[in-house]
């Protein structure tokens, strides 16, 4: 692959200047949370490494992951597709169709055996021998296994591929199955969400291209750089949660004031994703900022956890399990206790200082002799 076109060469061929290329590397480093100091390393990698071939296949899904990906802003999806990677097969985005598209698929997995990244959107249904999802005239499960056999790594796009999503909701008549339950001998990184945040998708690809490895993941296989914290942890309404200020109905005064949406069913306290920090639509907003609670779409089994508008009963708060009704009072109690302790300590310190202070008589000249 040494004679193949690199990312930098592809960008220069498209008329991108050196200055713009370095700016791109700086933005990529920032979006990955690596800091500006990593920009030179990203630049070196993209100047010297050939573009990675990517095969993107679709199982049971609604194509929302693709729709999200093409709206990426940092980096732009067009830069990822046309320059950063070599997206050789994606039956949604490619011009070829039918037999011609399948010939491309076979050529890529044969020519780049062991070198390409497999991106999977959707999941395989195992019921009725896989006949609930047909691709190229045969069950999708067969295509998935064939593509996975020669892949260097696999990306599970979205909640469908990661957990099963709505297709796997009870009673799961098609036996829709997450891909890690079917492919067990390959490294798989899960990027859940319905859909995932577009900038998260493109940033993960940038990381893999730059460092030739998967990003660090949690015990469930999600990249820590984007799924290491709950939406609740960085939510701008968090202060209202801690103060016990909650919206009680969609049209009340608390809703107009932007109070916490936890009582309206917001799943932010139990959902790990980057919505509250990265946001959507080029960082413009996210559901909670738009006035609607988080649905928890990045979590496993979110379709089977009751109504989207029923709140979580208990969540950890300040070392105890407090409900939304009591957490505000608890916070106020802690503050009141702290104020009380401070007041008592101040009074004791003041009395101690008063007892140690010499009297006015003791400081008068000659008093030492009189006392003697």
Curated annotation (Swiss-Prot):
Domain of life the protein comes from: Bacteria
Free-text cofactor note: Binds 2 [4Fe-4S] clusters. Binds 1 [3Fe-4S] cluster.
Bias (Basic and acidic residues) ranges: 360-372
Segments on the Cytoplasmic face: 349-372
GO MF annotation list: 3 iron, 4 sulfur cluster binding; 4 iron, 4 sulfur cluster binding; electron transfer activity; ferredoxin hydrogenase activity; hydrogenase (acceptor) activity; metal ion binding
Binding locations of [4Fe-4S] cluster 2: 232, 235, 260, 266
Keyword Transmembrane helix: yes
Pfam families xrefs: NiFe_hyd_SSU_C, Oxidored_q6
Record field: catalytic activity: H2 + A = AH2
Renumbered residue ranges of the record's region Disordered: 347-372
Periplasmic side: 46-325
Amino-acid positions noted as binding [4Fe-4S] cluster 1 in the UniProt annotation, renumbered to this chain: 62, 65, 160, 194
Any single GO CC term annotated in Swiss-Prot or TrEMBL for this entry: membrane
Amino acids binding [3Fe-4S] cluster: 275, 294, 297
Cofactors required: [4Fe-4S] cluster; [3Fe-4S] cluster
UniProt PTM comment: Exported by the Tat system. The position of the signal peptide cleavage has been experimentally proven.
Transmembrane segments: 326-348
Record's subunit section: Heterodimer of a large and a small subunit.
Described function: This is one of three E.coli hydrogenases synthesized in response to different physiological conditions. HYD1 is believed to have a role in hydrogen cycling during fermentative growth.
Family: Belongs to the [NiFe]/[NiFeSe] hydrogenase small subunit family.
Protein name (record): Hydrogenase-1 small chain
Species this protein is from: Escherichia coli (strain K12)
């Amino acid at each position: 692959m040494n004679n193949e076109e690199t990312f930098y060469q592809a960008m220069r061929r498209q008329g991108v200047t050196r200055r713009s290329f370095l700016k791109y590397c700086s933005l990529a480093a920032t979006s990955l949370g690596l800091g500006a100091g990593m920009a030179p390393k990203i630049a070196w990698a993209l100047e010297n490494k050939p573009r990675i071939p990517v095969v993107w296949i679709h199982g049971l899904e609604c194509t929302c992951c693709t729709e999200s990906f093409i709206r990426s802003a940092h980096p732009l999806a067009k830069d990822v597709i046309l320059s950063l990677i070599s997206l050789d097969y994606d039956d949604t985005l490619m011009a070829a169709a039918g037999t011609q598209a399948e010939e491309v698929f076979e050529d890529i997995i044969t020519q780049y055996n062991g070198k390409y990244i497999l991106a999977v959107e959707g999941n395989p249904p195992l019921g009725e021998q896989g006949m609930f999802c047909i691709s190229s005239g045969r069950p999708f499960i067969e295509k998935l296994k064939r593509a996975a056999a020669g892949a260097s790594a696999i990306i599970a796009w979205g909640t469908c591929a990661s957990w099963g999503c709505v297709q796997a909701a009870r009673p799961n008549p098609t036996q829709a199955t997450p891909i890690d339950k079917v492919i067990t001998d390959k490294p798989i990184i899960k990027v859940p969400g319905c859909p995932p945040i577009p900038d998260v998708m493109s940033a993960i690809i940038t990381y893999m291209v730059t460092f030739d490895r998967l990003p660090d993941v949690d015990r469930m296989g999600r990249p820590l750089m984007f799924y290491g914290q709950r939406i609740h942890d960085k939510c701008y309404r968090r202060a209202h949660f801690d103060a016990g200020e909650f919206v009680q109905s969609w049209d009340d005064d608390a809703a107009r004031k932007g109070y916490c949406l936890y009582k309206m069913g917001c799943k932010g306290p139990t959902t790990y994703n980057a919505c509250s920090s990265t946001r959507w639509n080029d960082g413009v907003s996210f559901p909670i900022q738009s006035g609607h609670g988080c649905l928890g779409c990045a979590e496993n089994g979110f379709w089977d956890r009751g109504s989207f508008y029923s709140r979580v009963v208990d969540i950890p708060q300040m070392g105890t399990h407090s409900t939304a009704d009591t957490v505000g009072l608890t916070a106020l109690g802690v503050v009141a206790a702290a104020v009380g302790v401070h007041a008592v300590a101040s009074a004791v310190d003041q009395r101690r200082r008063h007892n140690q202070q010499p009297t006015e008589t003791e400081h008068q000249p000659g008093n030492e002799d009189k006392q003697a």
